[in-house]
Amino acid sequence: MFETLIPRFPDYELIDSGDFEKLERFGRYVVRRPEPQAIWRRTLSEEEWRRTADAAFLRDARSDERGVWRLKPQTPDRWTVGYDHAGMHLRMRMGLTSFKHVGIFPEQAANWNFIYDNCVRMRAEGRTPKVLNLFAYTGGATLAARAAGADTTHVDSVKQVVT
């Protein structure tokens, strides 16, 4: 039997991956985007991927990193998803970027839980946690710390976020 340590995240699902792409659900919307680490064959057919995806990232022929999103009608380019853990209730804004990102990194959920749980423990011990989140990017870890009552400082300087 194969076990994973992935936290419960009802607003996220990895539907399929392979052939250097991944098909993911964030809330009610399914996105198709490049994934260089998905070196295996996908399970679902190309037709199923096309039919399922509400948004698909198309790479710019002149750039390995940039591209555009093709959206089905009625698919927004921004929406929110929720994430809950042990009293932490996060609402995070999804946003489709020109460099294939969507606004969060769901694989970081275990880290959000760790940060939240440790900040809650520190507060229970009478200490005020102080969190300096460098390279903070989308902010999931900062939100988790703040939700637990930590004093937080969120810093990032990735060019696409600053400009």
Where are these regions (language model features)?
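Non-catalytic substrate-recognition/targeting regions of SAM-dependent transferases
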Residues: 10-24, 31-106, 113-116
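Short, flexible loop segments at the rims of nucleotide/cofactor-binding pockets, characterized by
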Residues: 8-10, 131
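Conserved SAM/SAH cofactor-binding pocket of Class I
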Residues: 118-163
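Single, functionally critical "micro-switch" positions that shape active/binding sites
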Residues: 26-27, 134
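N-terminal accessory targeting/assembly segments
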Residues: 1-6
